[in-house]
Amino acid sequence: MGRQTRAMWRVLVLAVAAPLAFATAAPAQEPELLDPNLEVRTAVSGLSEPISMAFIGKGDMLVLEKASGQVKRVVDREVQGVVLDLAVNSASERGLLGIALHPKFRRNGWVYLFWSESSTGADSDTLDGVRLLGNRIDRFEWDGEALEFDRSILQFRAFQADEGQPLRANHNGGVLRFGPDGKLYAIVGDTGRRGQLQNLVNGPFGPGIPDDQFGGPEPDDAHRTGVIVRLNDDGSAPRDNPFFRVGRSMGGEVGANVQRLFAYGLRNSFGMAFDPRSGDLWEQENGDDSFSELNRVDPGMNSGWVQIMGPASRVAQFKAIETDPTAPQPFTPNGYFGLQQIRWPPTNIADTPAEALSRMFMVPGARFSDPELSWKFEVAPGGIGFLDSNALGGDYRRDLFMGGARDFLEGGHLFRIELTGNRRAVDVDDPRLEDGVADNINKWELTESESLLFGRNFGVGTDVQTGPDGHLYVVSLSKGAVYEIDRAR
């Protein structure tokens, strides 16, 4: 059990369950918190699809707008102006996505951005409006008034075109974080690829069929999808990366990419954060219709996609949900559903944990482990972050907070997740979560997550961070705002 008692948890279940019957009929509401000792204030509003932020001083932040490609400076709750304007392609999940300040930012002014470059030279939102390697990480230099391009760090696949299904622009990842080790970490989604880093040893068609989408050769760089990369500040691979020696033995472009990997087998993620106490990396992972995940990422982690989502023991449930013909079918006119790829349909999912584990592509030194927490049906987790202060009270210090990538659950949920004393696992108050799975009864539904609910009506929460003042800040893409959480006045 965590810091709350089971009796307190039962009270909380009743408190959050009562308004559910009215959620669909109610108009859009302002964010609210369940703890009456805390309050939400608007740090800035009037933004267009804000997606990520970085604090360059107290009351001074840079906020990214996904579709406009603009980086805006906000000082004392007011937008001061645009400090950078990039020509982005914002179709689906592309756009200006992530920002991270160099650990020595005050000295060198280096700012790193993850963005999808438009192929037209102007902002665009068409599915074909990117180059093949249109997702990129670049370094810029802050001069006190604007960001100036310094150098390109890395480029990733962006264009998705596969025979038999429509163009797509999702699963780009885009989150950037510097770790306590001074290295740059970036999440790259699978961009619809189906190859070795998606745990398909021979690609989806079986052996003997050449296809540069499944591991090379250049210029595809599919061997850099569905991964977390760990980089030196110039984009090179640190020699202590988990697959550095393996990549060196492989040689060539593929080997150089493998050297940069910290983890692989990811589907897609909108949230990544370092535990301020242990230094461990945590990330959330979005499922299709089932088994969103929260993972503590050890070096060399194979997260299991596409063979497994959620715990290995639940693979039969994973298959049953993803092959259910009554499930939502966003591409019904094109005749397929489940896993968003006809090239490896969900009917291929293994029937047993042993079968699923035996199919996985294990780079020497890789390891698979079950997620620390998962949800049976999709809840669409969004940005995550730790509260690294006592500003909200000691009970909240170093807890993990998770927004929603969709606003269907509680108008945009904000979850609070406590960790165990050794910081290696999730500490739950609800005995139903002791198996590590919230067995909700449908998509966007709260059952077994009542004890996690911290706030509602935050819309699409894409970034969560502790500010220089110790307060918790949440970026809401759908509400065009950044919210600040503090003790009630």
What name fits each language-model region?
Residues 22-28:
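Sec/Tat signal peptide C-region and signal peptidase I cleavage site
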Residues 2-13:
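Bacterial N-terminal signal peptides that target proteins for export
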Residues 3, 28, 339-340:
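Intrinsically disordered, low-complexity regions enriched in polar/acidic and amide residues
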Residues 33-34, 94-96, 104, 117-119, ...:
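Beta-propeller domain segments
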Residues 11-21:
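Bacterial N-terminal signal peptides
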Residues 452-457:
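Short, Gly/Ser/Thr-enriched beta-strand-loop segments that form substrate-interacting elements
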Residues 28-196, 200, 271-274, 279-290, ...:
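Acidic, Gly/Ser/Thr-rich repeat motifs that build Ca2+-stabilized beta-propeller blades
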